[in-house]
């Protein structure tokens, strides 16, 4: 796996050395939960400090205070927080990123994050306490208003964000992190209540904000109207910017979970889901005393969903012995406190008993049950860590279970006549697994791959027509599409590695492509949209499962690739015109305005940000940007690479796509069962492009310029060609002209196809390498063309493309 990339002025993250450890004395085994309890209580018994124009700087956050600090009592001989009452100002400079600058403007209407405030809650495990002047000694009662602020702080923060900050602080102490973290919540100013976090080990950004591209800092606020927090700004540390490199978040993972053995009790699905997850893991950091896990992340505050439906911990065992754990109401995770410190390569077995109302019932389907979140029902450490799985489900005899992997057991429960036990096994390492429960009908056939090898079973888990209040699903059609699309992608992208494939019906308006099993909405009409939908989810076997995305910034490698894969399949399965219509709709989606809470926003979705920003493109002022950019623009960017890897003298589709298919198959093989970054893909693309016909014709042997323009920037050019035809000797002609490239930076360049149509429905193809505002060309042809067009098939993404004969 690639370990380092540079930070261009603002978009990519890179990997460097992990943080140094402090040389503090180790915490004794019985101290961890006491430390947590003291931090969570947040009692202001640490004395007070009046200040006037006192300035405190933490990374890019500058704060000025006039008033009084009331400090928490010491924990492990250190102060971990304070409440400020008075008047103050703060300023957080926007990092050197065009997206962050535009994002801040879009969300708060300013060029920098600035505000006044009257109260502030500060929590830390770094050296913040050393920056204060001497304070009054411990003891004594704090001011009543400060005590009220402290008393309500932790519970409210956990409710709004899912973050248990006290647990994060305690973990930082017992694991001896250095540097530690810093958090401050401001309130009482013109921006109301908002928060700033600097977490050098990335734990809160990864677990609770899905920000894992190396960013250590966040500025965010809870938005009641959307029932979740909204990130105003994310940033690397000041040292990262100075070095030009930063650590990917997964460098700081404490453990690597290699196997899950899960017992799932589905015997009372109307009431609750109960399970025991036994995790086999290897420790990957020194002196680990506490391990955080995410669970139920993504559940919102709407109708108290996270409070009412979260899976609650009922017990924890480490290597067979009971162990301490913490999980608060509203928390989207848990922390396990080990009985003693463990170091690298130490194997651990951790068992967690969980129970909660985590199954959802849909009125459209009677007797079928699905997790409230298909991706958050098992505890996980880090982001998309891979493991193997043994999943045993105990359920009513009238139900059956669909899940990932191979079904290796389905038989009556010897301890209860009315129950069944069904076991699935996933022997390939994967990141996410899912299940569905209901009176499914299983429809089966086999998939035989053209490349040879043993056939694999294919199953579609369909609800009986009488169970659903929606139109019946034609199982033969779904099975045929699953079979066709799987074989097609295996032929062009490389070997399908799993021992089975299938899908389960779910009554929701989206699909999800888990390893070996798709969750499919009702779709069985022989139409382009259906072909594209099923094949998109099938393509996730390669783009997302076989090859995962390294960080949220790289998710276009999954969704954009699956989207374009579905276009290729649909053009073959139906007709080229259907694929052209899908591409047209994708291009059109970029030109529409973003949606806001009050209606249509300003500008175009294309301009919200580059595709490298992943889910952060969506906000309360830019709904729809993630779908338009990561899915659709990501697909169109891959389509342009398809053209660049082809022979410009031939139709890339008709000619067999050799260069493109070889590149994609090589990418799969190099990162099989691994995660890839955009830079990883760029390296593969560079190798394959260097000797391509387009590279030879244009004198360009690498694609760094292409990724800079289309992945890291937001440009959307318009092209227009003006040409004329002059007769030459012996019936030949000379075509000369100019291709104009508008609305993009002056250094923008792009090879653009030109197509000539001759009598007899014959065609000729060439390419113009456009650099800057315009480029001229001349081409000699053996006969006069009936028509000349600039990129009539839309290989190059543009707002508009036009051709004029002079």
Residue ranges of each PLM-predicted region?
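Zinc-dependent metallopeptidase catalytic helix centered on the HExxH motif
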Residues: 369, 384, 393, 518-595, ...
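Positively charged n-region of N-terminal signal peptides that target proteins for export
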Residues: 1-5
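Flexible glycine/proline-enriched surface loops and loop-helix/loop-strand junctions
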Residues: 372-377, 468-470, 547-548, 615-625, ...
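Acidic/His-enriched low-complexity segments
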Residues: 24-484, 488-496, 626-628, 671-674, ...
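Catalytic zinc-binding patch centered on the HExxH motif and its immediate surroundings
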Residues: 492, 497, 505-519, 524, ...
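Acidic/His/Gly-enriched intrinsically disordered linker/tail segments
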Residues: 559, 563-640, 644, 671-672
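Bacterial N-terminal signal peptides
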Residues: 8-19
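Amphipathic alpha-helical substructures
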Residues: 285, 618-620, 625-737
